[in-house]
Amino acid sequence: MFGQRQSMIVYLHSLKHAKILRKYGNIHYISKRLKYAVVYCDMEQIEHMMHKLNKLPFVKKIEQSYRPYLKTEFENSRPDRAKEYDYS
């Protein structure tokens, strides 16, 4: 039902234009102090959206999130203490 989504961090010159970013995806978070917005869009359209957003005059730079490409399943680095003292 839902496609894969990916986030991009859009750095802005001014937050006055942050509402315009709604056209390009779902706004997840806006930082007033650091002047950036986290915008989610479909993975298939991420390159196209980044190209369109770079053309806007109020955008400083855009960074793509690499979370979909990272391994998020971790192994336990320390052994379980309860299993260490199993005497049976």
Swiss-Prot record:
One term under GO cellular component: cytoplasm
UniProtKB keywords: Cytoplasm
Localization (cell): Cytoplasm
UniProt cross-references to InterPro entries, sorted A to Z: DUF2129
Pfam families: DUF2129 (PF09902)
Family indicated by similarity: Belongs to the UPF0298 family.
Protein name: UPF0298 protein BC_3932
Protein's organism: Bacillus cereus (strain ATCC 14579 / DSM 31 / CCUG 7414 / JCM 2152 / NBRC 15305 / NCIMB 9373 / NCTC 2599 / NRRL B-3711)
